[in-house]
């Protein structure tokens, strides 16, 4: 039992000897796709030179090329396809001048990539996995039975090599095509958002949801069949361990296991990456909406001021006392109504300044508990502090008190695993759950 393989130098020498090369500008690629499409409609899979010229004429018209030299250009294109091993030409002495053309495996592979493989189908993937599962089960049963070298080659190695491995490659190709489609969707979303983000929101949502759904369907289908496939591969691997002459089968099984792991792993990673991109797009849209809201208001205000003498207007405001009473202790509850939206930097600076002052005061006051080794009941302490501040500051003050308290020590009751009782800390329903700190 042997495995066909070639080294890199051998492959390079082979490609150089046969003068392999592919050059497909967009018009030639379009011609090849047209040939493949027309060829798929024929039962015999053969095309005459006249049919190829007709296909080339359609492509030439689509590219708005001159029709005067279409015969010469079509002949050059056909000869170029034959030279690049995309088409096979067959001639007969009895019908001289009427050659027959067939697509080569290379030509079929290229056109399949652009035509057939672009469509993702959960049913197609399910059928592929069903076929793989059947082949693997038969191979595992044959491996468990054992036999001579011919038995292993025909009933185990051959199905794994020429059926299972090829379907795994097809699934891997489907994933790579999905990668390209994701990138294309990202480009489409970027173009939509750059043009008009308002009109693009619904289109972006549709593209995001469709791609997410397709990725999830692909991954769910793979994970549903993955365990059974791995189990049968392990059965074959266990059967080969008692045979020293089956290293080729063992290596093939290892490669298939690695490929299956890679397929399932990349499927999940692809979903995670797409989720991150989805969040990024939604964050961008939210930011754009906020910026646009402020920009529209500023633009309307600027325009109103500029056109005041042509179109006078009057400013009407309500609740004048609240607007003028800037020293009111309860103004924190109405900051957004009076002054509008603060930039994030100013909000952070205001909160940070208050936090530093409160933290220093609270830290100094709580240090007495540590000095005297007195138990610190967080529920009572927090309630006393909150009684000194308006309701709008309760959350921030409670967070500072708790943060400073837990730095002093720990509660030995925490190590018992029993939950602490909930204690009310203000008259508005806020509660805290914490054991008494008694070890500093």
Swiss-Prot record:
Alphabetical list of InterPro entries matching this protein: Chromosome_partition_MukF, MukF_C, MukF_C_sf, MukF_M, MukF_M_sp, MukF_WHTH, WH-like_DNA-bd_sf, WH_DNA-bd_sf
Report the locations given in the UniProt record.
Cytoplasm, Nucleoid
A Pfam family name for this chain? MukF_M
Q: Name one GO molecular function term.
A: calcium ion binding
- Record's Gene Ontology CC terms? cytoplasm; nucleoid
Q: What is its main location?
A: cytoplasm
Q: Which GO terms describe its biological process?
A: cell division; chromosome condensation; chromosome segregation; DNA replication
Annotated keywords:
Calcium, Cell cycle, Cell division, Chromosome partition, Cytoplasm, DNA condensation
At the top level of its lineage, which domain of life is listed?
A: Bacteria
Among SUPFAM superfamilies, the record links this protein to: MukF C-terminal domain-like (SSF140570), Winged helix' DNA-binding domain (SSF46785)
Where are the annotated segments for Leucine-zipper? 208-236
Q: Which CDD domains match?
A: MukF_C, MukF_N
Described by its record, this protein's role is as follows:
Involved in chromosome condensation, segregation and cell cycle progression. May participate in facilitating chromosome segregation by condensation DNA from both sides of a centrally located replisome during cell division. Not required for mini-F plasmid partitioning. Probably acts via its interaction with MukB and MukE. Overexpression results in anucleate cells. It has a calcium binding activity.
The text of the family note is:
Belongs to the MukF family.
The record's note on quaternary structure and interaction partners says:
Interacts, and probably forms a ternary complex, with MukE and MukB via its C-terminal region. The complex formation is stimulated by calcium or magnesium. It is required for an interaction between MukE and MukB.
Q: Which HAMAP family match?
A: MukF
The identity of this protein, by name, is: Chromosome partition protein MukF
């Amino acid at each position: 039992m042997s495995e066909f393989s070639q080294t890199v130098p051998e492959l390079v020498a082979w490609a150089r000897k046969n003068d392999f090369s592919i050059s497909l500008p967009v018009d030639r690629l379009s011609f090849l796709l047209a040939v493949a499409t027309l060829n798929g409609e024929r039962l015999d899979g053969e095309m005459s030179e006249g049919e190829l010229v007709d296909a080339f004429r359609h492509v030439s018209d689509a590219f708005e090329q001159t029709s005067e030299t279409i015969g010469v250009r079509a002949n050059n294109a056909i000869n170029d396809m034959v030279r690049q091993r995309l088409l096979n030409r067959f001639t007969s002495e009895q019908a001289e001048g009427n050659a027959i053309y067939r697509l080569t495996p290379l030509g079929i592979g290229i056109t399949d990539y652009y035509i057939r493989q672009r469509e993702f189908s959960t049913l197609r993937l399910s059928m592929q996995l069903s076929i793989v599962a059947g082949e693997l089960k038969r191979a595992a049963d044959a491996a468990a039975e054992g036999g001579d070298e011919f038995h292993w080659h025909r009933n185990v190695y051959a199905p794994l090599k020429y059926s299972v491995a090829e379907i795994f490659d097809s699934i891997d190709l489907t994933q790579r095509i999905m990668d390209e489609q994701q990138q294309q969707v990202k480009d489409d979303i970027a173009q939509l958002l750059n043009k008009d983000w308002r009109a693009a929101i619904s289109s972006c949502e549709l593209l995001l949801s469709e791609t997410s759904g397709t990725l999830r369907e692909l991954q769910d289908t793979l994970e549903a069949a993955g365990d059974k496939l791995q189990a049968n591969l392990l059965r074959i691997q266990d059967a080969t361990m008692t045979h020293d002459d089956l290293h080729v089968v063992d290596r093939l099984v290892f490669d298939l296991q690695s490929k299956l792991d890679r397929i399932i792993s990349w499927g999940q990673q692809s979903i995670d990456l797409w989720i991150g991109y989805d969040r990024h797009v939604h964050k961008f849209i939210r930011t754009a909406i906020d910026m646009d809201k402020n920009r529209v208001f500023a633009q309307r205000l600027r325009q109103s001021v500029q056109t005041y003498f042509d179109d006078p207007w009057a400013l009407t405001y309500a609740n004048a006392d609240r607007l003028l009473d800037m020293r009111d202790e309860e103004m924190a509850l109405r900051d957004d109504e009076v002054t509008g939206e603060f930039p994030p930097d100013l909000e952070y600076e205001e909160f940070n300044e208050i936090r530093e002052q409160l933290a220093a005061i609270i830290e100094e006051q709580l240090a007495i508990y540590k000095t005297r080794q007195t138990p610190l009941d967080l529920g009572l302490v927090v309630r006393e502090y909150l009684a000194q501040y308006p309701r709008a500051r309760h959350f921030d003050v409670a967070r500072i008190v708790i943060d400073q308290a837990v730095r002093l020590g720990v509660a030995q009751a925490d190590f018992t695993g029993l939950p602490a009782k909930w204690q009310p800390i203000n008259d508005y329903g806020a509660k805290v759950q914490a054991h008494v700190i008694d070890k500093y």
